[in-house]
């Protein structure tokens, strides 16, 4: 597979020793930006390879997207020979991305302190649940746990009767995005100033920084309350029209006038609490009730036409099954593709463009160890050495087989 643009990170080599979503998503973004990514895998299957089902035991719905533009090498890192391969691989790399806990990294000799003297240009990016040096860095942490501990789950309790997790892997994905930002900044610093940084990212810190942008709110100044009241109002959400659900966000005074005037209720805007933006924000419960009663008086299509004509932000509520099946709704972000092993699938498009062009999709997601032999030769192992590593189980190679025609 090819595209006219490889990406701004072309020439950067990234080694990934990571599982589930946070680490693999970060390296997938780096790969989409043009970096060469080598995914190091062991005998235990990365959990991301089974998320979302699929036709092949190693290529789930999540895996075919999370691991695109990567190569895979399978190594036994507990064996000295496997660690030696890993060291050679890291010596050839610019960035090392891992979400192994510090104790595990140290036991493998892959911690920053061990590697820095022999690899002074390697940017060591370690992402765990909790901050290094906190005493909690070796605690297990997954998305649900971080949502609970950072107060995200409690926010839903403030608008309903039950504490709930946000129904997407927000902690993993926010942390992945921040890790990418830090890795790219570290690359710039190394090339501009000659210093290869150790990058550390805590999921807890990332998610807390993410949601406190608005929810620190009054607690920014001691004595106030945390939580952004308008967002935490139980009546905030899509509203019913005569025939469906819509999201309509009037912000400016003029927006409110256009909506209320459409149903002959503009006089209400002269009284409390509609007279100013501050008044509306401080009395969100009453304001949302008023907006809901107005929107019930017309059909969804009528409101969409009015809002489009008046420049008011609005959309109909789209079902998840609808958006993944209708190109007009997903706006070209899902692309029909064909994997040589997993068969036909829908690929998630790249959300960014450079000079109007999408990032290149250079290769499909590999099965475990698909590129083991290829990479060993690149690291100057001889044919006899490669055969010995494979024979002893230190390095693994997955046989790549086509799906039977009935599964395609």
What do these predicted ranges mean?
Residues 132, 160-170, 191-207, 225-231, ...:
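Conserved Rossmann-fold dehydrogenase catalytic segment
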Residues 309-362:
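A glycine-rich dinucleotide-binding beta-alpha-beta segment and adjacent secondary-structure elements
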Residues 50-53, 216-226, 326-339:
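Short, surface-exposed loop/helix-turn segments at secondary-structure junctions
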């Amino acid at each position: 597979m090819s595209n006219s643009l490889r990406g701004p990170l072309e020439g950067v080599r990234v080694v990934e020793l990571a599982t589930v979503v946070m680490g693999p998503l970060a390296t997938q973004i780096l790969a989409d930006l043009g970096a060469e990514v080598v995914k190091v895998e062991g005998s235990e299957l990365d959990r991301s390879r089974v998320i979302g089902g699929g036709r092949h035991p190693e290529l789930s719905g999540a895996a075919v997207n999370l691991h695109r533009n990567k190569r895979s090498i399978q190594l036994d890192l507990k064996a000295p020979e496997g660690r030696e391969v890993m060291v050679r691989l890291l010596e050839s790399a610019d960035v090392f991305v891992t979400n192994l806990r510090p104790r595990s990294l140290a036991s493998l000799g892959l911690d920053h302190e061990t590697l820095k003297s022999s690899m002074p240009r390697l940017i060591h990016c370690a992402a765990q649940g909790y901050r290094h040096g906190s005493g909690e860095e070796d605690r297990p942490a997954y998305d649900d746990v971080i949502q609970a501990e950072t107060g995200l789950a409690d926010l839903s309790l403030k608008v309903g009767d039950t504490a709930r997790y946000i129904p997407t892997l927000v902690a993993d994905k926010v942390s992945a995005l921040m890790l990418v930002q830090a890795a790219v900044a570290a690359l710039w610093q190394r090339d501009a100033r000659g210093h290869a940084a150790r990058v550390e990212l805590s999921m807890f810190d990332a998610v807390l920084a993410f949601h406190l942008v608005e929810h620190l709110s009054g607690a920014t100044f001691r004595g106030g309350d945390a939580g952004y009241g308008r967002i935490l109002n139980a009546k905030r959400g899509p509203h019913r029209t005569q025939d469906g659900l819509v999201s309509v966000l009037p912000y400016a005074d003029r927006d409110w006038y256009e909506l209320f005037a459409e149903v002959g209720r503009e006089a209400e805007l002269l009284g409390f609490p509609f007279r100013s933006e501050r008044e509306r924000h401080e009395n969100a419960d009453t304001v949302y009730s008023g907006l809901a009663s107005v929107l019930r008086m017309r059909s969804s299509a009528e409101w969409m036409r009015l809002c489009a004509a008046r420049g008011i932000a609005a959309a109909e509520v789209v079902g998840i099954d609808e958006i993944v099946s209708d190109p007009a709704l997903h706006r070209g972000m899902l692309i029909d593709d064909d994997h040589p092993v997993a068969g036909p699938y829908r690929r998630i498009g790249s959300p960014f463009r450079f000079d109007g062009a999408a990032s290149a999709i250079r290769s499909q997601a590999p099965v475990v160890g698909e590129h083991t032999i290829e990479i060993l030769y690149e690291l100057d192992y001889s044919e006899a050495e490669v055969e010995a590593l494979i024979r002893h189980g230190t390095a693994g190679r997955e046989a790549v087989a086509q799906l039977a025609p009935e599964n395609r």
